[in-house]
Amino acid sequence: MQSVATNNITKTRNAHWRDYLELTKPRVVALLLLTAVVGMCLATEELVSLKVLVPALTGIGLMSAAAAAINHLVDRHIDAKMARTLRRPLPQGNLSPAKVTTFAASIGVIGFVTLYAWVNPLTAWLTFASMVGYAVVYTMFLKRATPQNIVIGGLAGAAPPLLGWTSVTNEINAPAVLLVMIIFTWTPPHFWALAVHRAKDYARAKVPMLPVTHGIEFTKTCIFLYTVLLTVVCLMPFLIGMTGMIYLVGVSVLNAIFLAYAWKLKYSPSKKTAFNMFAFSIWHLMLLFVILLVDHYV
């Protein structure tokens, strides 16, 4: 099956719009845009103007989608060897590399121009740096070079709250950086839980994820330690007076559940514990930012 998928990379049919949509990783981009919206809202006591909100989300969304499409393009041969990614458009031959390149470049340029012209140059360049960080630095180099790939490369994926903040303020301020640090610290336990679940896939594709290079048990220890660190970082918005009791109670519950998953994965795992932790981590981040928003306006 994998050899057929590999051969299909050069055999394309008429692309369906769903193939292009899949290139953009819409669920990932939706989560990124949620964090960007929260960044915007926390930057002001007033409601965010639609004149800022619409072009900012359009530009950030398009450039995030472009980065995702480049990731599909660069990783197409790796994806053909992994069960989780085998059905993506490029391994299946639904799209050609040339079409994906054109698509990514087009939406990336439109996104940058939108931010530069209708939001502000600072946000445009920061979003561009984030796109390059993920699509080039992480995907092309770090992912293939070091088991710390997602630790270093995670900074690019953590940028959207800052991008939302600068869309409103045109400044980089400490609260926005703290929001970035929450996602940056969240990223390793999120991805390493998936890597533990899919360790054989990554080994087959020769991707040096931590479970492949250092073993499952070492990775579980790192996941637990990073989850403890995440718990501390998540408390910082309350400790510095950025949020109130609604956030403290909500994030404490989320952190307790996340820590419970990390503990179980380390000391009494079942077959599905790693994947369940990965799945919950997405809810953790999404709900954390929703709680930030509720706390800000209530």
From Swiss-Prot:
Signal peptide: none
Membrane-crossing residue ranges in chain numbering: 28-48, 50-70, 95-117, 121-138, 149-169, 176-196, 222-242, 243-263, 274-294
Coiled-coil residues: none
One Gene Ontology CC term in the entry: plasma membrane
Superkingdom of this protein's organism: Bacteria
Gene Ontology BP, a term: heme O biosynthetic process
GO MF assignments: protoheme IX farnesyltransferase activity
Role summary: Converts heme B (protoheme IX) to heme O by substitution of the vinyl group on carbon 2 of heme B porphyrin ring with a hydroxyethyl farnesyl side group.
Note: Carbon 2 of the heme B porphyrin ring is defined according to the Fischer nomenclature.
NCBIfam families named in the record: cyoE_ctaB (TIGR01473), PRK04375.1-2 (NF003349)
UniProt similarity note: Belongs to the UbiA prenyltransferase family. Protoheme IX farnesyltransferase subfamily.
Pathway participation: Porphyrin-containing compound metabolism; heme O biosynthesis; heme O from protoheme: step 1/1
Recorded topology in the membrane: Multi-pass membrane protein
Subcellular location: Cell inner membrane
EC number: 2.5.1.141
UniProt protein name: Protoheme IX farnesyltransferase
InterPro entries per UniProt: Protohaem_IX_farnesylTrfase, UbiA_prenyltransferase, UbiA_prenylTrfase_CS, UbiA_sf
Major localization listed first in the record, in broad terms: membrane
Natural source organism: Idiomarina loihiensis (strain ATCC BAA-735 / DSM 15497 / L2-TR)
UniProt KW keywords: Cell inner membrane, Cell membrane, Heme biosynthesis, Membrane, Transferase, Transmembrane, Transmembrane helix
Reaction equation(s) it catalyzes: heme b + (2E,6E)-farnesyl diphosphate + H2O = Fe(II)-heme o + diphosphate
